């Protein structure tokens, strides 16, 4: 497979929007509408990507301003081009050092903080930005022990590119649920931490490799130039096809574990 730019491709990411949308909506379903009604407060979508969820947050909580924060200019350009609701705006920012311009009522983040090493130590600071009763809502993939992610390292060590990919590990490790519970409990009036395994239904050629190429596989691809980039991808895709075989009906089932955290500030 010939690969195009290794910049985070918004169109490739959105190709799997349906598979990624359900966890985002499940997380949103635990938010309290009363928080969104706080005068002078803002809902922040941290790691907003192309803005799909930011726009849904605005629909879910009419009257509340929503600000999407992301580090990718390409994603932000996509988000702005597809957003007409004037209550929704976007800004470039570093999630590791997030400082809100306006007081937050809800800090929402879908599949972003797993990219940041040491993210668990950032969460108490996020909680302290909230008023009493405000909510922190976070979802992160916790699939790093599954073949889809373990085989990234196998492929990285299996070719002439091994030296270039040494030390690249993709997403940061997402801890056991109890670790997040223990860190956030002292600051929380209410705290929910749970996991869900989604059976994602994919189709087409190399569907799991295509899926991960816009997320966890991306750092490996970015570290290589052609022709090694395509050769590495093909090696990974071959390994993945054995771990997640295509069924006779053309469907590939891709189990994907995700961690959810919803904390209400004490």
What role is predicted for each listed range?
Residues 42-98:
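Class I SAM-dependent methyltransferase SAM/SAH-binding core
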